[in-house]
């Protein structure tokens, strides 16, 4: 990837621009807000102008309700060869893209799972995505070259790609981010009725609880919640049944004499289920361990164009990358690029890369 356009210069879009510029990618910036655009350019995320010619990739970093119309508009103008969005909802976005007649072969849904206080370009950081999971959601007809370009973007930003389908993505986001945020919001709402003494007592404790969505991001958060309502309802119904069971247990405990005693076995079971569920989440995000993949290692020198040439050759081999890792070799300026593919594709990729004079090994 040599050129990119970032459409939307909030915290995410500007951070992507900073990361791409660090990798030598010529980045152009577009935004409906002249102020945000000037700030993003000033912090070094790219050039605040439309690209003079078709770019390799357009990153659409706009609120969820605008993703499909923006992609449709830029596809009609030929802005980029491929498109990636960063919205937190995928099923409804894909449905809207299809309804607008977009070329889904060139579009890959994306969603970097990051969060930090603040919003807008001044909150951006070039290392925002380092080591963080980044969901990639190709459609059934997505070109291999489009997915490979999206994987290249994720690698350039230092994130870890997780490839899955739209339905699985939305279910995961409902369970792991939206429902916890709803629960936290409901608890926080109870604080409006707490007395001032209780609030003083809870000040430092509450600050250690994961961040409640801020007013600056409330609109986009509610858009994701509304668009993802169906899987959220399903998870809340399960949570409601668990809560009803817990209430029944606690009512039984409350009917006692209030003395300290050994914990009720059902309460221990409740806590243990939470521990067991939390322990299932891998410490390192990436392709699920049950998915068998093969790695192909390629030595790439430090010229900026070489990494782009490698990804172009991988796409030319007709192979879909399922994961990628780039590491610096300690004894030279060269990098080792580890490409994860299916075992069936590994032999073909190795043959094609060697044919194109790449030093590749499996």
UniProtKB/Swiss-Prot annotation:
Domain (Prephenate/arogenate dehydrogenase): residue spans on this chain: 2-283
Origin superkingdom: Bacteria
KW Amino-acid biosynthesis (keyword) present: no
Keyword Transport: no
Class of enzymatic activity (EC top level): oxidoreductase
Record's catalysed reaction(s): prephenate + NAD(+) = 3-(4-hydroxyphenyl)pyruvate + CO2 + NADH
Gene3D superfamilies per record: 6-phosphogluconate dehydrogenase C-terminal like domain (1.10.3660.10), NAD(P)-binding Rossmann-like Domain (3.40.50.720)
BP terms from Gene Ontology: antibiotic biosynthetic process; tyrosine biosynthetic process
Function, as annotated: Probable prephenate dehydrogenase that produces 4-hydroxyphenylpyruvate (4HPP) in the novobiocin biosynthesis pathway. Novobiocin is an aminocoumarin family antibiotic that targets bacterial DNA gyrases.
Protein family according to the UniProt entry: Belongs to the prephenate/arogenate dehydrogenase family.
Protein name per its UniProtKB record: Probable prephenate dehydrogenase NovF
Gene name, Swiss-Prot/TrEMBL: novF
